Design a protein with these regions (language model features):
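Charge-rich, well-structured scaffold segments of protease-associated domains
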Residues: 6-201, 206, 213-240, 246-268
């Protein structure tokens, strides 16, 4: 998540502060963003103008594969110590765009539940980690670790390039070859994610999350029952599971959902 932000803070061919936000103001784009998940980071954009399309592709490719990743950007986007308060009340606090963002996200009980569930279901794979960043752990990341992670993972051998529209695919490939691929050699990044080993018996886990002082702890417990099912590439099993989910809990009249609500075991 920190790397997703930091690569957009200047690159080899665009050594300006925040070229991403500069393009937001100047471009004819209909969409520009960046997303991070447990096993991928995506830099999507869209525009209806051919010239703008290649301008945006130029900025995005250079940002992803040849970013500056300077220390000031790391401190801005990741974490740093700031002085706050005055006089005897002065103190040091952690700040940073991603750090503050994730502090806000992880203050939500629902987010804590989702992250805890993934941690419990996938204890032996990358999916156990909070890809956004755990606020308590973010300050342990170093600038050198961030650069090393980029060198290993942000490589064409570990990337997919997706294009859509009525522009020439041949032109797209020639552009990507000239800007990026011609400067790299193929490697094995070793980023395959193994399947989570299956358990022989069910497991129960307990996680904690903070409450406001005014909240009643007796009314703030959350419960979740989950199963590790088919491989995501097994499209038939995934479809069947989605249908079953809709039948059982898809709306207020669904039998399982209605039974749980009528039981008054808790509140939704």
């Amino acid at each position: 998540h920190i790397l997703e932000h930091t690569v957009l803070c200047g690159s080899e061919r665009f050594p300006v502060r925040d070229p991403f936000f500069s393009m937001l103001k100047r471009s004819l784009s209909t969409f520009m963003n960046a997303f991070t998940a447990s096993d991928w980071t995506m830099y999507p954009f869209a525009t209806q103008n051919r010239k703008d399309y290649y301008n945006l592709m130029d900025v995005y490719l250079d940002a992803a594969f040849f970013p500056d990743i300077d220390e000031l950007s790391f401190k801005q986007e990741g974490h740093r110590l700031d002085v706050t308060g005055e006089g005897k009340a002065v103190r040091l606090v952690y700040k940073g765009v991603v750090y503050n963002e994730m502090k806000g996200a992880m203050s939500s009980p629902d987010q804590v539940m989702v992250r805890s569930l993934l941690n419990a279901l996938y204890p032996d794979t990358t999916y156990r980690h909070n890809s956004g960043g755990e606020p308590a752990v973010i300050p342990s990341l170093t600038h050198e670790q961030l650069k090393a992670f980029h060198a290993r993972h942000y490589h064409p051998s570990n990337a997919f390039f997706y294009t859509y529209g009525n522009l020439s695919l041949k032109d797209h490939l020639a552009f990507i070859e000239a800007r990026v691929l011609s400067r790299f050699s193929r490697i094995d990044p070793g980023t395959d994610v193994p399947a989570q080993p299956r358990w022989t018996v069910p497991k129960a886990v307990v996680y904690h999350y903070p409450l406001d002082r005014s909240e009643d702890p007796e009314k703030k417990y959350q419960a979740c029952v989950a199963w590790l099912l088919a491989d995501i590439k097994d499209t038939f099993e995934v479809l069947v599971t989605a249908v079953i989910e809709q039948v059982l809990i898809g709306n207020a009249a669904s039998p399982l959902r209605k039974a749980l609500m009528d039981s008054q075991l808790g509140t939704a």
